[in-house]
Design a protein with these regions (language model features):
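Generic beta-sheet signal
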Residues: 7, 57, 149-159
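Active-site signature of alpha/beta-hydrolase-fold catalytic machinery across serine-
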Residues: 73, 164-168
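Acidic, low-complexity terminal tails and accessory targeting/binding regions
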Residues: 1-6, 49, 80, 94-106, ...
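Phosphate-handling substructures
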Residues: 17, 77-138, 203
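Short active-site segment of divalent metal-dependent hydrolases/proteases
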Residues: 15, 161-162
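Short beta-strand scaffold positions
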Residues: 61-62, 137, 156-157
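Conserved histidine-centered catalytic loops in small-molecule metabolism enzymes
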Residues: 52-80, 84-90, 112-114, 193-211
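Active-site-proximal alpha-helix that buttresses catalytic centers in soluble enzyme cores
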Residues: 5, 11-80, 130
Length: 211
């Protein structure tokens, strides 16, 4: 995919639901924990060190409160105006349908295993929810609509959806049964930059909640 400029990508910091191992998806939202704010703070400091003096970024964010909270901390570090952020619904997390608000343990008590532990991805589709090809389609639409942008971008989003975005930007193959290009999982608190189909780590997170 021919994308101009660099795209810095991070998921939000740890939330109350992340800590409780409870599904959030695209609709439910909970605030960051102290760990989540610390992760955002560390990513912001790392990005400030990465950028050269005078370099600016376009700010793009999922409309979820947890993503916007994370971006507010990062934007302060790099001296950017959070109010100038573009809120982009296509950056939302995967829609987990009927699983939203339930713990992983509760769901597995009803259905058995729902995760492919090797890849850190769902092994079955959430009832009334999305699958990974749905995420890939909405993110492809966003990338194509914004392909004219030459400025560097900072994109704050979510665990599952960020893996699909990275997969698209890196030109990874579509994998079954997920029907989408999906990049490897990274610890929460990690930020990467993708340029010309190559990925570098800006800040390596040390948190859990791999996605």
């Amino acid at each position: 995919m021919n994308i101009k400029g660099r795209i810095f990508i991070a998921r939000h910091g740890e939330t109350v639901f992340n800590f409780a191992k409870r599904m959030q998806g695209d609709k439910l939202d909970t605030p960051l924990t102290r760990t989540g704010f610390a992760q955002a703070d560390a990513m912001g400091a790392a990005l400030a060190d990465w950028l050269k003096p005078g370099e600016t970024l376009q700010l793009w964010c999922s409309p979820s409160g947890r993503a916007l909270q994370t971006l507010a901390v990062i934007a302060e570090h790099i001296g950017h105006d959070w109010h100038q952020t573009t809120h982009e619904p296509r950056l939302y997390e995967i829609n987990v349908g009927d699983w939203a608000g339930r713990t992983y343990a509760e769901i597995m008590d009803d259905l058995g295993p729902i995760m492919d532990e090797t890849h850190g991805l769902f092994s079955i589709r959430p009832p009334k929810g999305e699958w990974y090809d749905d995420i890939a389609q909405r993110l492809t639409d966003w990338l194509e609509e914004t392909a004219h942008i030459s400025e560097d971008r900072l994109v704050i989003m979510h665990g599952m959806s960020s893996r699909v975005l990275r997969g698209l930007l890196l030109g990874l193959p579509v994998t079954e049964p997920w029907k989408a290009p999906i990049a490897p999982s990274l610890p929460q608190g990690t930020m990467v930059v993708v340029e010309n189909g190559q990925e570098q780590i800006v800040r390596q997170g040390g948190g859990g909640h791999l996605a």
